[in-house]
Amino acid sequence: GEYFFVEGSHTGYVAQGILLCRRILVVSSDIFVINDTWIGRHPRETSQHFHFAETVRLNTTSQGLEGIGATSRFSMQFFAQEQFVRMKLGTAPLARHYNKMKQVPDLTVNAENCGAMTTILVRRRDTSPVRITPQSVYNEAYSHELVPQQAEGFVIEANGRRHGVVFLYQDVGNTEDYNGICGAYGLGRVI
């Protein structure tokens, strides 16, 4: 399948012994995965922040968040290495144009005692359900399950399609070992 992947880091916390690495994976044009990994000394509480267009209506659900805008709707779910994730909805000032601040819907997602957070956003084409299921990640060469601090996997079922995503947080095996979920294995940091 086709996908787009970007990886970068934020060095603003290096003086505190923390390097933030962000990976963004776009699967087709309607599934976006944002994975933040804190390297070094992990902060006790980690967070991700999101701002939305002023016309978007947000509602929390048992699975995460639903959003409805002027032309689209979306679902968001949040994961933090099996730790509890808290959501806080509010508003925040945002400038889309020079010197024109507006209050827009804002979401903060927090978790404690984790080294990574993953947000999965699915742009919905209809009202059919979106299912995002955490999956155990396996190393085929050593025939064992990796712990969430080593890797996390997700199966995303939406818009009539099914995708699997794996994030490795540390090297597991060597460059010839396969890591994966649901019987599908591949090389690299993201499959």
Question: For the regions a protein language model found, what residue spans apply to each?
Answer:
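CBM-like, beta-strand-rich accessory domains located in the C-terminal region of large
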Residues: 1-191
